Amino acid sequence: MYLLEILHRSLSYEIEIEETRSSPNKLIKDSIQSWKNAFEKEYSVIIKTFYGSILNTIQCSNMTCGNIENVFEPYNCLQLDIDNKTNLYECLNDYFNEEEHINDWKCDKCQHIGCKKNTRLWSNPNYVIIQLKRFSRNGLIKNSNLVQYPIRDLDLTKYHSTLKSDNNKYIYDLYAVNYHSGQLNFGHYWSSCKNLDGHWYNFNDGNVTKITQEQLVTHDAYILFYHRKFIKKTLEI
């Protein structure tokens, strides 16, 4: 994601982000304010194309309190744990599963330590990037687990927050895969991409070869690139 950050910094400019629709929904207003805080001073076509917003709902685990905080977080890549997973939906279900007993959070209302956290998509970009977390934190151990992922019709609709009135479908098709073989410090990267002619091609250093769709899913798949089937011209924050 380093390249996206460089492109964003190079192309960024200041804009004025305004609420384009009146709404009594406080969450919508908060989401726009969060977007303004993050990008109003530095906006670019990269933000419009690759960035979305995640809603973290944090609830105090003290039953007599139940204080709820909603925190919006911009994202340009979903980093998914693949341990003991066989397909991408299992990874997504785990990522968006409710977390309980988070002990490093302190309630502002009752000062209780501990909460439950629920993560949901709030807005999704037209182009979604998904990273399969193959490396441990120290980078010394690689997980070569085979994770099946859809070439067509990846459905992210059910991972969207029910707190937002949204009847849209979020269906995506794969258009590129980045692969990695070896270990982090001495590995090799290459990519497969779908061309405008509808065929898939493998790009490995100076070699370009035509491949079949069946060759796309391997133990070396590292980063997946999806585009939305029905492109929205504007991002709904």
Predicted stretch roles:
Residues 32, 36-41, 45, 63-237:
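Exposed substrate/partner-binding surface patches
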